[in-house]
Amino acid sequence: MEINRLVLPGIEADERPIIIAGPCSAESREQVLNTAQELAKNGVKVFRAGIWKPRTKPGGFEGVGTVGLPWLKEVKQKTGMLVATEVATAAHVFEAIKAGIDMLWIGARTAANPFAMQELADALRGTDIPVLVKNPVNPDLELWIGALERLVNAGVNNVGVILRGFSTYDQKIYRNLPLWHIPIELRRRYPNITMFCDPSHIGGKRELIAPISQQAMDLKFDGLMIESHCNPDEALSDAKQQITPQILDFTLKMLVLRENVQTTENISVLRKQIDEIDEQLLTILAKRNRISREIGMYKKENNMPVLQTGRYNEILEKRAQMGEAMNLDKEFVFAIMKAIHEESVKIQLAL
């Protein structure tokens, strides 16, 4: 699959960051127009608003529906901004295109459902409308890529992605964990893909929008999708993660865009050291696996079980203590040792 850079009317190919902003939900004509006009004054080129809102639980505000589409059309006419909304069904696609919507995005819950993605791909077949795909709710890169493949296979080639974070049971700082390594790997596989970050959904609160946006810029994301409302405290959905157009403007002006520069000699030297250390790590892991295989042979010959829980717990505890003494994060050490142990078990089971 080949993915090229997203093409948006009126936006230069090298423009960065591309800002998509607007309320979580279109609630009324007045709210939509007031917010859009303030955003347009500040140079935002793409206005977003949810018309249909798939909620985690029933009973919450689920959007105004098709009655809100003329409001977006009016935004386009009065401000010149492109307008975007979320679609989750083929009917949404048909209604949005009929109303002249310029850009669509597919939400996290929909992206996680191959049946829904195929329905949308079929509905979009033959169109050239830009489509952004949010990451699935669970951290599965292949599922994300699969959603993109369904669109591309249907001839929908003007596509990009939005990182909105991943759902976890144990929520601490973030509403949805960014897990930056996943979009980084996506970029590695598809270097030309256009990537947006949604700091509103990642952070879940206003005060996290600025730092998450800066992190995204440092990681060379192409743009940001940020929820902005003329009166966020009165918003009917996700009030805590929306900011006023004025605060958005201030936030964007504070972003630092680091230019691409040639690697300095010092960094080259340090990277060479990293390469050498990685080689040593792999050599040591290979040696460990050989010893693990010998232990496995002994267990097999003496009718001993492969998995010995006491030994495993001892390894985890002692290695965590060793790691802490070396200023290594405990969870990081646990993750490494668990992966190494799983490989050892796999080797011994194969004997």
Predicted features and spans:
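Catalytic beta/alpha-barrel core
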Residues: 64, 80-93, 102-117, 129-141, ...
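Active-site mouth loops of central-metabolism enzymes
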Residues: 17-34, 58-60, 81-87, 107-108, ...
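Domain-level signature for soluble enzymes in the chorismate/prephenate branch of the shikimate pathway
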Residues: 260-351
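N-terminal amphipathic alpha-helix/helix-capping segment at the start of soluble metabolic enzymes
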Residues: 1-20, 69-70, 74
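Alpha-helix-loop-beta-strand connector modules within alpha/beta enzyme cores
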Residues: 61-85, 120-130, 180-195, 241-260, ...
